[in-house]
Amino acid sequence: QINTKWVLNKKINLPVKLTTEQKGQLCDTLKTSLALLSRETDPVTFADEQAVQLFNMGRGFSIALVYLKKDRRLSLESYIGYMAFKNGIPVSYGGGWILGTSCKIGVNIYPAFRKGESAWMFCQVLRLYHQNFKVSYFYVNPYQFGKGNPEGLKSGAFWFYYRLGFRPVQPDINVLSKTEWKKINTDKKYRTPVNILKKFTAGPVSLHLNKNNTPAFFAPEISTLISNYINKHFNSNRKAAIQNGYYNLTTQFQLTAKNETLSLLYLLADKNNSLSLKEKKDLANVFMLQYNNSEAAFIKNLQKCSGFWKLLNTQGQK
């Protein structure tokens, strides 16, 4: 049994110093490894090669973090890909979609390595995202443990996450999982029926590392807030809303660079007077970093951007 929180809090090493040539070679390795599996992920396909990082996690295990090129980045979340190696051999890949201190995490362990150290390896991925990006809330979509994924159901993947401390977000499913877990611990021969495992896929599972820092919003919810505002105030004309936001930004801060997400967020702030001038300026500065700086810097600054979170809370209460 792995003590997840103990593992996640064990201090990580600084990234390995890589030359420009070594970074290029590492990115080639990532692409080749996925190609051999007939797989592809956006961070690997559209990698910012000079931003790639490699971390030694101990016991011959290392993880490469790969970032998207500036023109491929998402509007709100930061999609950070990874590939893990055991003694230099690729054993796992996936990615994390980070927004604030929350992260939707996905993992794919190569078939030959799915037994034995699978849980420990995934914990190392969580450890890296927790410490390198200050993530305190991880969640896993139901597909990872069986929704539309027969292999996930057959393998009982739900219990893989459960043993690491993840719990169903939906209260009724959480109660059901506790009942099943008790049966498993009482009778070692007991196996959860497939129809119960299917019920578990009604919603995501999550891991809280800081109970006092539960995320209030996720990217789809923010998109819905913005869409509802556009529908109400601009008769569903997104282009007009964006242009209005640009005008306000240009008028108040003389910003000429284009960022549609910032334009729409600023529009919400400006129309509702929910932010002070300083908070608006901080919001603008953070989102201008999104395409003009490293994605790691954007993640860090967005976490500290009180105006962004205040704006969402104000809109969410309406």
Residues of each region from the PLM?
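Long amphipathic alpha-helical coiled-coil/heptad-repeat bundle
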Residues: 1-8
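A conserved beta-strand-loop-helix scaffold within acyl/acetyltransferase catalytic domains
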Residues: 11-114, 123, 127-133, 267-272, ...
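Acyl-donor binding region in acyl/amide transferases
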Residues: 98-173, 178
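Short low-complexity, flexible loop/linker segments enriched in glycine and/or proline
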Residues: 153-155, 183-187
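Extended amphipathic alpha-helical segments with heptad-repeat/coiled-coil character used for oligomerization
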Residues: 175-185, 198
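Long, compositionally biased intrinsically disordered regions
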Residues: 186-318
